[in-house]
Amino acid sequence: MGEFAFQTLRESITSAIRSKILTGELQPGVKLAEQKLAEEFGSSRAPIREALRQLEQEGMVEYSRNVGCSVRRVKPEEAYEIYL
């Protein structure tokens, strides 16, 4: 039997947001509003929140208390290690 390519909704959303960050569609410092992303991806906020937490662990976004999540600003020397 062949292998199945299967991604959860969270994985698909994580991949899409990661791609937008890497291509520059989402610039450093841009706030990532869960509700807006949920509307864009046609999902509830739960998989968006999970995707943003995954991207936070990867160092691509950061959470600030009482502010929310935003695309992380990185120094050039950090970019290679994080994104490649």
Where are the predicted features?
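Short linear motifs at protein or domain termini
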Residues: 1-84
